[in-house]
Amino acid sequence: MQKQEETLSRLRTIFDIFLRENFSTTNNVYFEKLLTHLQAKENAFVLQAPFVVEWVDRCITAVTEDFKKIHPKVISFMLNLTSFLANNEWMIVRLRELDIVNRAVKLLQREHNLSPSIKLGGIRLMKAITVYSMGLAFLRMHRIWTLLIQYSNNDHTLYVVREARQVLYNMVYKSCDKLHDKAVTLEILSEIMQPIHDNLYKNTDGVERIHVKVDDNEMLHKISSTLDLLSYILQQTLVLEERTTLIILLKEHHDFEITVWKLIDMTHNPYFTEKIFTTLSSYNFALLLHEKLLNPNATEPSEEFTEFGLAFFNLMKFLITRKDGLSFVKLAELNHVLWKKLGPRAPKEIVIQQERVTFENQLICFHMLPLLFSMKYAQKIADEESKIELFDAYVVKLLEISCEQTLRLCYTMRDNFFSADGMAVGLVTAGLANKCIHSLLALENVLDREQAVTVCQALLYVLREAVAMSVITNNGEDDCHSVSSAGSSYLKLYPRGTEQVVNDPQVLHSVMVGLRTLIERFKITWKESVETIGLVNCLAFVLENTSMDARCTVQALKLVQLAVEHFLSPNMALLVDNLQGSALVCLGPIIVKRMHDTMWEVRDTTLELTTSIASISRIKFPAFQRFLIDSKIPPIVYEMAKNDSEVYVRASAFQCLSQMVSINLLWENGLSQLDLVDHLLFVMYRETNDIVRSEAVITLMKIYEHRKIHEKYKNTLFSTLNYCVIGDHHTEVKLNALNFWRREFYRQFSNQGMIDGSFPTVTFSKEQKKIVTLTEKEIQTSIAKVFGEVQQYGYFGILLKCLREETSMEVLEFLIKGVKTMTEKFERYKGIMEEIEMRSPLSDRERPRFDFPSQPQPTPIPQQPPVNPTEADEVIESILNSQDAQLLEKAFETQMQINAQGKTAEKRHIDEFYYKQFAVPLRQFFEELKTIDLDQLVKQHQEWFECKENFTSLLDDILGALKRDDENMISDCY
């Protein structure tokens, strides 16, 4: 209760400051934070405090008297606060008594030059009171929809327009279908439609005629916002579960479809045409849903969509006659989105003119149509029977999924976009092809799998076109990945001119991005699309093009990686022991070449591809192991890890090496001869980049798991690990180093005979080289050996230091989880502590010294005996009188020798006995652990990292900020 009183006291002070006549602030963020806290459930008591409503009353009274008296941010804050109060039914009574809402609405209607934040606050207040029928009646009485239409139509900010449209839709929908007030509904609709009617019709001498004024910018701008508002309202009705009569009112009282169609005569502007057709499409779908699918009195079968289908095809045909390819593709995308909004209410198959079709398939055909025009290469592979059969099968598939009207439109588009002799007239452009692909990718989350496969096949054929075009351009010779071409005869194929589309780098990039997105999203394999079998061949040719830009090269490499991961059948690994005769053979030289590319993005992506190949080669496709060795890739990867100038490339190289070191063939044929361990320890200690150190720890852990590390590195290894846990500032490095320690535990216990977390009754002893029976005493001895070993290397010391000093939440959670597990396991065995102390006692000099110097300690200067003043004078005189010209030269040489010695003295590795300062006995570790509340530690850090601001502290911050603003105002006066 006392805390609430403190909060209210501070808030009352802040509210009083807000109403000062000279109030000004430079920090607007505090208003938003304050509103957020006031809206929270735990602060509901604030809104119930009497002074809050009284402050709102004082504020709106002051604003009514003199608008400029109150700061605009305070007015906006007041309106938002009033909307919070209106959410409480009991507060509505108090608001009515003080006439607050009425005065707020009059303020909004009276003032025209309000700031967007004030308008937004007013709209939110209206939104809050529309929840109540009494509030809706109040807004209706004030004809508030005129203000909302104004906010929706004029040049306002995105937030104002969005909120205004939402409130307006709620008003018109509730008036129509909840209150059944037809008169008010028609009045609102008439107000919305007025800009269209005013500019579309002219009354001359009592005779109504159509007024046509083509491409008047001011008029188009006004009508565009009206069309946007109508489209929003119509599309909102598509998510309703109940039927609304809004659509039939638009149809009967405004002849909506014909009225909007007439706007077409006013413009040749593609942008405005797109707005018109968006509105018409939204209307068609709303009419379909509410007058057919949700109408219980509908007489036609639910699958009969002839009227809807013809309306859709008319829209598409009009855009073809206008030769507007971009709007054509955009309209297909919009219809796809609207169709998906119908959800399960729409049948899977519909009937259009006695023909049963899948509507989404028609949309997909229209999406791909500009791309399909560029498929000429299939005509050149007629001599390859298998390929022409594949393409024929794909064409037949397109014909089967298309209805008659769709095919007619396809031919109409061909005739309009190409001349009679098949020459492109500049309408099928690279920009249009790009839009097709981007439009399809925008529907990635709504496409069915079957449609995604159809699109993927089309993109594969477009990629082949790009390869065929490159053959002609570069006069390439046939090899394992090239295509058969007949030279310039390709360019003469029908239709001519489309080769410029597939030859565009942006189109090629979009095609590869589209393929990768669809294959990843829908897990497409060669079983669904046989065309994917030739994907690597095409990409190999693309990658051999030295003039290819970096973006395309990166996407091609990523697509090759995806093809290797998805399209290699695991069963083939049993039949193939090498890659001879496969297009994959060509990848070796390509990978090596791209590893030396000047662009670091290309080198990095090449390493990702190599990492994937190495991962697959371990089990799934062993033939890749010999592929990597023959191409001499492992040594190149190691050199990149050591010497590449880009940190991301070095990190990727270590990631690649971590996959390679576990493969015996790669280790024995190259990696074992490299100084991997030495360099990794150097990187973990000396590297300045975080991600490189992190990957280096993982790589060293993989080597430690699968290979033997030389005994001379053992002390340095654990010292470096402890340094990474204690001295490194990067969370990932710490976690990887701790994970390394965890793996060391697993390895030690495994060596002692533990299997799946427990000791069996019988095991094979490596020491005695025979099968032995494990007793309780022998198990304790084995555990003692493990704990003695890790105790010696300082594991328990670094745990304690981290628990007391660590600030990273992830590291703490990892540590605490491990400590709790270890404590639970340890309590199962009694007397084990004495066994550990007996087996591995720590000497006094090995006791921990928790000092971690951030800088190396300076070497003390040796004390020299004092120099006699007389001798000093003689030395100075001898130097001054010296004629030795080499004096400075000798001094310079001496300095150079000192610098050289200092440079070589810089150590590559950490002190190998660094670990000893953390060697804590296990008994001391558990005693120290008892003084730490682990759960409280996690809770405390959780509060820090979630940054939960206390409401009272926020109010203190606001008071401090307001005080500083006042001081600044006073200083400005002088």
From Swiss-Prot:
Lineage of the species this protein comes from: Eukaryota, Metazoa, Ecdysozoa, Arthropoda, Hexapoda
UniProt-annotated location(s): Cytoplasm, Cytosol
Annotated Pro residues bias: 855-868
GO cellular component, one term: nucleus
Protein's name according to its UniProt entry: Integrator complex assembly factor Brat1
SUBUNIT field: Interacts with IntS9 and IntS11.
Annotated PANTHER family: BRCA1-ASSOCIATED ATM ACTIVATOR 1 (PTHR21331:SF2)
SUPFAM superfamilies (alphabetical): ARM repeat
